[in-house]
UniProtKB/Swiss-Prot annotation:
Belongs to the class-I aminoacyl-tRNA synthetase family. IleS type 1 subfamily. Keywords: Aminoacyl-tRNA synthetase, ATP-binding, Cytoplasm, Ligase, Nucleotide-binding, Protein biosynthesis. Monomer. It holds the Pfam family tRNA-synt_1. This is Isoleucine--tRNA ligase. Catalyzes the attachment of isoleucine to tRNA(Ile). As IleRS can inadvertently accommodate and process structurally similar amino acids such as valine, to avoid such errors it has two additional distinct tRNA(Ile)-dependent editing activities. One activity is designated as 'pretransfer' editing and involves the hydrolysis of activated Val-AMP. The other activity is designated 'posttransfer' editing and involves deacylation of mischarged Val-tRNA(Ile). One of its GO terms (molecular function) is tRNA binding. A motif ('HIGH' region) lies at residues 57-67.
Amino acid sequence: MKLKETLNLGKIAFPMRADLPNKEPQWQAAWEQAELYKKRQELNAGKPAFHLHDGPPYANGNIHVGHALNKISKDIIVRSKSMSGFQAPYVPGWDTHGLPIEQVLAKQGIKRKEMNLAEYLEMCRQYALSQVDKQRDDFKRLGVSADWENPYVTLDPQFEADQIRVFGAMAEKGYIYRGAKPVYWSWSSESALAEAEIEYHDIDSTSLYYANKVKDGKGILDTNTYIVVWTTTPFTVTASRGLTVGPDMDYLVVKPAGSDRQYVVAEGLLDSLAGKFGWESFETLASHKGADLEYIVTEHPWDTDVEELVILGDHVTLESGTGIVHTAPGFGEDDYNVGTKYKLEVAVTVDERGLMMENAGPDFHGQFYNKVTPIVIDKLGDLLLAQEVINHSYPFDWRTKKPIIWRAVPQWFASVSDFRQDILDEIEKTTFHPSWGETRLYNMIRDRGDWVISRQRAWGVPLPIFYAEDGTAIMTKEVTDHVADLFQENGSIIWWQKEAKDLLPEGFTHPGSPNGEFTKETDIMDVWFDSGSSWNGVMNARENLSYPADLYLEGSDQYRGWFNSSLITSVAVNGHAPYKAILSQGFVLDGKGEKMSKSKGNIISPNDVAKQYGADILRLWVASVDTDNDVRVSMEILGQVSETYRKIRNTLRFLIANTSDFNPATDTVAYADLGAVDKYMTIVFNQLVATITDAYERYDFMAIYKAVVNFVTVDLSAFYLDFAKDVVYIEAANSLERRRMQTVFYDILVKITKLLTPILPHTTEEIWSYLEYESEAFVQLAEMPVAETFSAQEDILEAWSAFMTLRTQAQKALEEARNAKIIGKSLEAHLTIYASEEVKTLLTALDSDIALLLIVSQLTIADLADAPADAVAFEGIAFMVEHAIGEVCERSRRIDPTTRMRSYNAFVCDHSAKIIEENFPEAVAEGFEESGK
């Protein structure tokens, strides 16, 4: 027998290398075979409910790292709730209608307008479902636990029917109407867009300063006066029908030197404009308030059939321009709102494809709208005072990445103004994480216009509206309920397969159709109405879910998207928000803080991360970042996270190895019988349990990450395990000292494995497989630990905090001795502590082997007054380091004066000799194989 065989080195079957890319799929297969999600739901039956509603990602392409952040975050929350006494099902969803899928088919050469519509829609449907399958596999690879066999998909007939019922309820309350307001119009998509489908980019535009000649000055301005206006969209001058001034702003009539014309501009902008126009000097002829100029009539710059009226508007500012805004009600929301008050014509001179229409005039007809600036300049002639290129923020279609325009076209709207205050009241009742989300959503709802819900596309849910012979729109409850039932049975495809009369209830009549003839709407609903109705199609429809949901969790862009649309529909129909709380997260940027894009080559694919590092590394990254703000990720950052993971894994590996002979049923030592330092570690660990429990409640994953890393690296590795290994290795296998520490080891191991399961489910499942005494087959079926408190806990923590200060001081003294070549490693030291009475009292109270804790072979405690001059001194304490006396025990590696060669060929100290002689009589009788001496 070899001497080292008398040590309790533990069985280390748990591998140091995680090999996550290969092992994770094996665990996922095991979970699926064991129907783990289903079993967890069965365990939680009857418990309090926690229902997170999954915002549906768009079904197109593999998932990106933003999807991973979102889904992993949701999984962490739902797993933690499921293990903490809540019935917490997770139903994933997908958004499957809309333009992107039409664009994919177009790129494949499929031409919608040249084929049967039903056939085309079926192709869209099949493509969407294929993308659902692709993304489902991607999410499952990340270890996300969900009801994958029963997701909600917005193209499902049941979902479409429930969406129609939401529309019908809003229509019944009068919230759906048709109007010709200006809307965001995408010429590249040939469709209206909602605010949530807009993104802004900085672009260069040519802006023009020009003048309208006064035609009727109403006794205030004479006819040789010109009103100066500014535009950044020259094409809209073709539809200009008014000039808007600020009612309380001051305007001057000035006559430039050498000119026979006089001009009206805002007083606050005159100096800057004079420079732009080359007016070296000018004479001020008069001053007027904007309100005085109301109803003055001017000539259109070139269209002699058009007059432009001076009107008043509160949206006019002195930030730029001339203080006078040319007003084209067909091309702007403010223009429309102020223009309708004065009954200005709502002229639209651009068609759905962005081409100038015939009513723009023969010089413009057929030209692309943003190519007509040279024509406008030519038509203005000497009315043009200046032109300049400006850089400004401009709206783009978020899908096609092309600029859009405001354009008045007949559309269907959902009113927000009718119940805006009700929505705002509901926002104030909602909990927000982070708290600033409340202000953000509140302001968006407060300031938004009515919602354009119609789209001029094919792949989507039809608007269930019929038209009588006289043009009356029909959307009564009887009709929408019937359409909903048809969709539930057949899917929305039936809308395109049947005539209007066959979609109406049997025997339906209407006074507007004396001949019984009806037509149907051909527009579809905005896809935000699809997902915005999910509270009804999912949370309100499924027995195992509830409405309102406990939590909606999405990226911060969803304040104007899903959070917004869901809130509007829910309050409209039921008078309350669809959620009790909202958690929003920042965007994922690359390692340099830049937006990810294919062109930059900085995209991080979750699938690539899973192949290189493993999903648990990506999950740990999610827990490590502050998602209240934008977060960064790169392969280098993930490499750093992997290093942290390795430290956690290897620390837990040590605990597994050193509890391999520990049976918790027979070997556990009661808290009252633990050693003082073991009690301290138990208290510290339970504080960690409390911290993690609270952080899960607050959805603060980063707090969990920081607390776990600090505990593992500082409290365990750098302190407790640093000296505890000398006990568990060296003491007799069944000794009280060893079982005390193993009790703490095992308690930490089991509980931290449970606590980390929501974040690192694959790793903790592997650890759990080594814990043979735990009854649950999978850690995911276990319950979260509950933090305990202990008698005199605060006093114990205070005493050990003081010791930690002493320990740091002692380590400094030992380091100086190392540098002076007095010792090599700390076990070569004889440390003398010269202590004040206060420190002596502390050391006595600790009731511990201080030499063991400081990892020195010999320790002496003396009076502070006796400290030599060359001692390393601190307030109330000093240290002296000398080389320990004696020889190194081959078994404990400590220097001990009792170390000598024993008759059984072992060069050991008396303490090791006693352990050997009591526990290994055969080795004593036969002698050990070899000795270093």
